[in-house]
Amino acid sequence: MVMEDNESCASRVIFDALPTSQATMDRRERIKMEVFDEVLRRLRQSDIEDAHLPGFEDDLWNHFNRLPARYALDVNVERAEDVLMHKRLLHSAYDPQNRPAIEVHLVQVQPAGISADLDSTSNDAGHSSPTRKSIHPPPAFGSSPNLEALALAASLSQDEDADNSVHNNSLYSRPLHEITFSTEDKPKLLFQLTALLAELGLNIQEAHAFSTTDGYSLDVFVVDGWPYEETERLRISLEKEAAKIELQSQSWPMQQSFSPEKENGQTGARTHVPIPNDGTDVWEINLKHLKFGHKIASGSYGDLYKGTYCSQEVAIKVLKPERLDSDLEKEFAQEVFIMRKVRHKNVVQFIGACTKPPHLCIVTEFMPGGSVYDYLHKQKGVFKLPTLFKVAIDICKGMSYLHQNNIIHRDLKAANLLMDENEVVKVADFGVARVKAQTGVMTAETGTYRWMAPEVIEHKPYDHKADVFSYGIVLWELLTGKLPYEYMTPLQAAVGVVQKGLRPTIPKNTHPKLAELLERLWEHDSTQRPDFSEIIEQLQEIAKEVGEEGEEKKKSSTGLGGGIFAALRRSTTHH
């Protein structure tokens, strides 16, 4: 999961002479060393026995090194003992019997701008008003401005209601719970953990997720919603719920219908990943005709190559054998199952797949233009206005086709939109797509937080309108060229979307009808979002109006005429 670190003005001045990437790297390493030294000093001063053992300093440094630099940047050095707890949990997670290792603490967030040292006071009736002095430690990773502001609002509300209620249950007066998980890193882990918390009625107020260099995770959530000011019952409840999720993850709901061996009563090792076949299509790739070229991209669970199949240029997505498990196989099977029947000019064309472990791969048409995400955020490209509308409508047409065939994509984002040499955009990556249930609603959670609909984040039932919300975020990306919620981590953005109604800021110069459409696309109530067929009509209408305005004004020679979004003008030119 991508997380962002923001430089201070001072650090940019100090490293002004260095290349940006080198300056950022040096800054992070320097801060990591400073944090390590401070944590070590505090642990030794607190007379923690382990801190004085031979080799402890090296062990602590190894702990910082196996986690991303962001861990050192975010951790609260005043809670040095929490670093030891994180180290212990990660060590405990080595044993499969201990997974997930769980720790629960009571924490208290200090409202921004209010002193933590104010004593409790008495009102005229002789009752003691709630004290503002924290009786519990702060969260291990401090707190975001949003969480501090939330605590401040609750504290002020508490002041207003003090005369009417002695036992005020505001966020500030009632401590929060900080829950730390450590387990083996795997696909969809965050979704499982957030689903676990939701099942217990817990509301996530703050979240931090870290992956170690050796394949483990450290996930920290600050939550409210537990009715008791204690930790043991909550920990036991979490362990019970985690056991249920672990059992569910070991099963494959569609295995029975997918597996001919099981239907025939056969047992033994599978020779291929079972995928439904109605006998009308042949999609198993003959590896003799598949030629690999250079690697295009690499991820945690697979690599993407350019190649040829029977002399046709293709893209080959290969799953890494060492990362294969039932979850990844299920995702692979689902992608093949859906893509083999999809035929549309705005959906990436499936050519075939190899389903014989350990060489699992999916072969599709090659898209030389790359992804919309790379074009916008890495190449700093700009779509000229007519092209922007064309791209937006292309995506709509592809998604409308999928929805007409009862397919919900569930992970619509700029990285999953690919361009050919003619700037035709096609929807790709169906690894987490699903055929809509007959009931019309679904409850499995996946996708990427920055683009995810609130009902999916909250693990509530959802339908095809979840894709419409994601499309709204993509359309905003096309207009601005910016990453959604770029100054927040993905988890912080998710909390903001659900609990505070957070949405990307629509630039002031946006055409009024387009601004209105964006707001409809990311409505919290999914029933208020339009279908893709309606979106296509509205975009075509807006494009026509903007074109007419441009013709009348005759002021733009760049194709970015002043009707819709003057802020689209950037120094980078389209190529």
From Swiss-Prot:
Q: Where is the PTM Phosphothreonine found along the chain?
A: T443
Its localization reads: Cytoplasm, Cytosol
- Residues forming the Protein kinase domain are 290-543
**Any idea which UniProt keywords this protein has?**
ATP-binding, Cytoplasm, Kinase, Nucleotide-binding, Phosphoprotein, Serine/threonine-protein kinase, Transferase
Q: Note down the stretches annotated as region Disordered.
A: 116-140
Q: Which GO terms describe its biological process?
A: cellular response to hypoxia; chloroplast organization; protein phosphorylation; response to abscisic acid
GO cellular component annotations of the record: cytosol
Which is one GO molecular function term here?
A: protein serine/threonine/tyrosine kinase activity
Q: Which domain of life is it from?
A: Eukaryota
Its UniProt entry gives the catalysed reaction(s) as: L-seryl-[protein] + ATP = O-phospho-L-seryl-[protein] + ADP + H(+); L-threonyl-[protein] + ATP = O-phospho-L-threonyl-[protein] + ADP + H(+)
Q: Which PANTHER family does the record match to this protein?
A: SERINE/THREONINE-PROTEIN KINASE TNNI3K-RELATED, SERINE_THREONINE-PROTEIN KINASE STY46
Similarity field = Belongs to the protein kinase superfamily. Ser/Thr protein kinase family.
Name it. Serine/threonine-protein kinase STY46
